[in-house]
């Protein structure tokens, strides 16, 4: 009875814990864990295989080798349990205690723990304020350190070499004390008075001026405070007692042939014990100092190797020259404890096999081979057989199953019915890589997979394998069915579009069915119903593509769900009428009355899901698939060599191009064009020739001319198999057809440059040897790229998951009024992403009004679904402020309103949804489709960079954004501001186009003027940068002396002379200090002011500026005073694809970033120094000036006296995300990262919802730096979680104290993962040693808030279905913290309670 109680108590104790704390172990604590001291290095007696006494495997210390049996065999069996044998001293108990009982080694001399010594920054070094080098010299017995200076002139912690030590001894005798080795460090650490030191440092912090010193002191202060608050003592960083790992965790296994396989740890422990024993003996013998010293040093080294081999000096190697695996290596890396055993476990009840197609399956089914099913469902079968009375015992049931009796198969059928199994295909890149299906038993040995789920798994049937897992418990089955069933995962979580769209054969079949052919058999017939059409087709009276008139019946569902039927006669084809049979009621016939390509089918399924819901869509998808397969078979579409029709024009086009190339070659040889120009031109010629050939080929392939019934020629789309496959989207693309029947075109070298001789042949004609050789470059590079790409993409996904893993939806609404402003994305003349796609499924943050009125169209907190988006489009709303996770105010999670719609389900997101992991998977999964290369701009691409005008594509009216302009004498506008944009607005006020226009642009139209499509409305010179005057007057040259600060040059062709300003470096000593400029003066010679300011109109001229005017010339507003030639911008490599995405998420600073204005104010230039200019910004309100040194070679966008706004670009270049955050705020940095990431994915045609990227950005922004501490506990300059500061500030405000102020900080995803509050999560990610060292010193405790920590400790995760469990536990915990009144109870009541408890325990078993 007593034992049972004990057992129950134990059970509950291990289960409930709310956190894990890590700290330093004191020597006494280590001794208290230990079950005895290990004194001998022996392991086991290799003849008897019995462990040696007091050795590393001693049974007396660690427990018995056999269950319930002592070593000498005196006590055996369960009845003696708990007895300690008096002969061999072994406790009689289970063997598994050898996995948990620890021993210890009493070290003869203290030893420093290498983690606290060597992991940077060295904790011991910080604590003692000594350099690591010095401490190492003390520890490894190279020099002395003063411990107690006494009355001498020495200082504590001073280093003494052997000689200086002897000198000091002679001088002071034993007044002072100096030692070497870990004892010395131990004494120094023991002497530190933490409280006093902390007070002293806090006092001196404000008065420290030097930045580096302040940083150092802050670091040291933080470490001291960590020790102080955690209750760790600094001297515990030095070990006096070494714990010994339980023997079963470092096993020694006898192999056959008398050899042993052993864990490396045993070797390392043996070295430590050997050296320790030798040192003890030497100390007893009072050996000479030098010998003892050497032995101590060796002991220190062996303990170092045991804790972290290879951290200091060379790693100790075993017999086979491989470094031994130390304790630190056991936990870190991919093979370490965290990633191998805690985060990745193996699963029982699983099997794997090759997959094949199951075209007859329903969407929720999979074919499971009988053999596999029998094995996987064994326990269920045994249970059923026994329950039926077909077998008396489990053993008999086993025999039956082994013999495969007939009844077994019947039982298997029953067991399997409606018991879902999970199928998984590696690599599992997103959550759709594991889905649940109902198994259908099949013969054969391959798993059958439904073709429509292949896209989600990224599976094909060329030998892929899949794994099957069986959910055992009822809850697991329930979750598999409700959440993971393939029929419940129709939409992709990445973009909310159907993921089960048909592909390949199915698309081809449906496309073929829905095509029309002129003069088809049965053309022009009238049918009264679809049934009649079917009959006509079956009897052969009408063929599939015949154009006919049919009366169809459509079901219309109105808003209230009322169904009504209506009939109409439509012009359609036989095939489309047949398709309408499988169309679910409630969808319009128009959806199938068209050529059904892949896009159309996808849209059809999407419409079906939104209008009719899940069930109808699933049934419809299956029907589509069966129909598609059927008609694809009937169509007999196949690829023959005659299908690749080579256009007749090809040869003339190629000949023309060759002639042009020859001409250019001649021009080059006569010196009219440079080599670079020739190369670019040649490539352009070939590129356009290739385009022409492919255009001719596509026209040839895609249409054929027929004579219809009326005898008129009519063009119709051709039934060429290759064309049909490409046009329907089943397989292949125009580019691939071009290589088959056009010309292969230009090829690239491995370094990315284009070879100027193209391949004019195509695959139909065949390639010659040279052409084939040129082609191999690209193919080979493609394969090499793919291999690299997979690894890189996987690593990106891992980092993303790690940074976002703990983000879960935890409440309905945080009530914030903030949000992101969403506008349609417009680049040049194209709308890249319309507003509806950006706001669909989001929640409105600020009321949206009808344009131009105060009436609310969409109130705050509206979830914008398809219907709302249509409304917004009708009223041509141009921008909406929507809620976003970035601005969400929830602590430790996000709220449903800020996230909006769950993309995979189509309704607002549920509590407990792990949005962080979903976001990481959605971004990481398409990673393998991105390219790896950096693009070098060359050839055709360089033409686009020298744009010089804006030509509009749509008619509308002109609108300027943040532009300053002046009107010149011709009445045209001249732009005099940077980063201005010009937009075209249609009559409804919607923005259609948007262009960046540079400084000095001349606009042909005034603002608000109407423009026609095709107008050129803005011009500028792309090669020079003008300086435009804003006032009219006459010009005066200042400091412009011929031959000193400028030279005159005369143009050979025109004969005009111009003035060129010399660069400072080219001037003589006289001109160094001069600053050439142009002043504008009125008729009376007085300075003119810039309009609206008190600043005189003076324009400084930088080096190499060209002035075309003479002194005293008259000038009008908007004229150019001077031009600064732009060096053709260095061809910057554009980082594209995966590396670009990684750079953005890691928030890496680009090389030569754009320089942004730190404050708003007026620009002026200070004294120049060697190679740099000094830029000064003076704020208008008379605040402090801001100075920055900028290298001379940077092209500046600003002139002296110009006004800039904070965050405006001063020098062009790629913008750094950190600068944007600092100067323009969170919203701008969020928009910047989202748009940049989306650009990369959009280029590859991958759709990802912005939400997912925002989720990652939220995690990158979760830290902040304290700028002023107020009355809080924080230190200035400390990096803290934003949520912690917010919570602390709320409390401070309630108490009427001063809250802390902070600045948000942007961290890259790796940094952000390592900086999480949870040390378990950080340690399992990267840099395990560093993270654990830091956590231990600070005595951190992990509240197990994220998903990863809970997986590691083996609990349900606080997301999904585990969210409820955690919520109830937290509520209970909050209750428990309130004081409880304890009731006293009598003995009989206690007995009664116990009886109830036992009954309960019995019923639960």
From Swiss-Prot:
InterPro entries: DNA-dir_RpoC_beta_prime, DNA-dir_RpoC_beta_prime_bact, RNA_pol_asu, RNA_pol_N, RNA_pol_Rpb1_1, RNA_pol_Rpb1_3, RNA_pol_Rpb1_3_sf, RNA_pol_Rpb1_4. The keyword Cytoplasm does not apply. CDD domains: RNAP_beta'_C, RNAP_beta'_N. It is an enzyme of class 2 (transferase). Zn(2+) 2 binds at residues 814, 888, 895, 898. Binds 1 Mg(2+) ion per subunit. Binds 2 Zn(2+) ions per subunit. Its EC number is 2.7.7.6. Its cofactor is Mg(2+); Zn(2+). Signal peptide: none annotated. One of its GO terms (biological process) is DNA-templated transcription. One of its GO terms (cellular component) is DNA-directed RNA polymerase complex. The keyword Transcription applies. It comes from the Bacteria. Mg(2+) binds at residues 460, 462, 464. GO terms for molecular function: DNA binding; DNA-directed RNA polymerase activity; magnesium ion binding; zinc ion binding. Zn(2+) 1 binds at residues 70, 72, 85, 88. It catalyses: RNA(n) + a ribonucleoside 5'-triphosphate = RNA(n+1) + diphosphate. Keywords: DNA-directed RNA polymerase, Magnesium, Metal-binding, Nucleotidyltransferase, Transcription, Transferase, Zinc. DNA-dependent RNA polymerase catalyzes the transcription of DNA into RNA using the four ribonucleoside triphosphates as substrates. The RNAP catalytic core consists of 2 alpha, 1 beta, 1 beta' and 1 omega subunit. When a sigma factor is associated with the core the holoenzyme is formed, which can initiate transcription. Belongs to the RNA polymerase beta' chain family. This is DNA-directed RNA polymerase subunit beta'.
